[in-house]
Amino acid sequence: EILSVTRDDEGYTLVLNGDEVSANKLVIASGGLSMPGLGATPFGYKVAEQFGLKVLPTRAGLVPFTLHKPMLEQLQVLSGVSVPSVITAQDGTVFRESLLFTHRGLSGPAVLQISSYWQAGEFVSINLLPDIDLADFLDVQRAEHPNQSLKNTLAMQLPKRLVECLQQLG
C-alpha cells in the first residue's frame, strides 16, 4: 500500500508500508470509487490534486438503480423480469435496451447505460412499450375484444407478472 508520494528534482518517492521506492516518472491509475469493500479509495485522486492536476468530480457510472424501500417492496415480485425499454435521461440522452427488475431495483443494459448520464435529483423516463402506441393499441383491442379485461389486454404486450404488479399498484 502506498502511504504517500513526494516529488523533488530527481523524481518521485513513494512511501510504502515499511519501504520507499524512487522513480523518475509516476503514472497515477486511480481506478474508481464504487467498490470500497474491494479497496477502492480516493488516494489516486488526492495524489493527482497534490501535483496540481485537474481532477473532475467523480460519480458512479454503469451502475444499477437502487429503489427506496417502499417501492422496492412493491416491485420485488418482478425480480428477474426483463423487458424491452427506451430510457431517457433528463438531459435527453436515450438508450433502447432491455431493462431488468432485480431484488434491489432496476438494472439491465438500458439502466447501466443511462446511469452514466443521470445525476442525483434528476428524473429518468422509462417506456416499457417502446414499439407500440399504447393509446392506439388499447383502442384497437377494445374495438376487437370489447369484453377483454385491461389486464389481459396489457398481458399481450408485457410480461404477466409485470401487468399483475401494475394492477396491484393501482
Model-predicted segments: where are they?
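Short hydrophobic core segments
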Residues: I2, E20-A40, A48-E49, L99-R104
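Acidic, glycine-enriched active-site microenvironments
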Residues: D9-V15, S22-K25
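A conserved short coil-to-beta-strand element within the FAD-binding core of flavoproteins
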Residues: E1-G11
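Short, conserved acidic/polar surface loops in the N-terminal third of protein domains
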Residues: R7-D9, G37-A40, H68
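Short loop/edge segments at beta-strand edges and connector loops
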Residues: E1, L16, P57-R59
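An anion/pyrophosphate-binding glycine-rich loop and adjacent beta-alpha core
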Residues: L53-P57, V63-G170
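Glycine-centered tight beta-turn/hairpin loop motif at sheet-sheet or coil-to-beta transitions
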Residues: L16-G18, G92
